[in-house]
């Protein structure tokens, strides 16, 4: 399991979460391996210049770039700021199990109307599909509301 965190969160994550997870076993009977990747600007590709006044990390793709050294098999991204329940985990597990060797990808998607908040705006990846019903692109869309 890879946690993508700010460097100053390492001790807290190890004590609150990492130690507990490391005590669990995988389906194969191995201990859960816990790794920490730091979301910082050192992972930003050379072709992109980070604005000098930028402090906040970029989004999910930036986080994945930071974790790339730890990812060697099918994986799932779970954002800490949204939780969609146990069924989402069951669904993605079933789909990942089918993809183990195919090199393909999958995702759990939701109708946009079910993911916006009545308490302000949200940012969501809005999925666009092609004529065959296959995912064509995901567009990060800001300030969405009901």
What are these regions (language model features)?
Residues 86-146:
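Conserved core of the sugar-phosphate nucleotidyltransferase
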């Amino acid at each position: 399991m890879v946690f993508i965190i700010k460097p100053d969160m390492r001790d807290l994550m190890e004590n609150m979460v990492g130690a507990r997870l490391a005590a669990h076993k995988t389906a194969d009977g191995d201990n859960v391996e816990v790794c920490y990747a730091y979301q910082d600007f050192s992972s930003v590709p050379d072709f992109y210049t980070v604005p000098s006044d930028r402090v906040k990390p970029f989004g999910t793709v930036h986080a994945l770039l930071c974790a790339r050294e730890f990812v060697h098999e099918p994986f799932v991204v779970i954002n800490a700021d949204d939780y969609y329940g146990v069924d989402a985990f069951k669904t993605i597990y079933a789909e990942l199990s089918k993809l183990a060797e195919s090199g393909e990808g999958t995702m759990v998607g939701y109708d946009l109307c079910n993911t916006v908040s009545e308490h302000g705006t949200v940012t969501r990846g809005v999925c666009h599909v092609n004529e065959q019903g296959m995912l064509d692109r995901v567009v990060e869309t800001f300030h969405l509301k009901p």
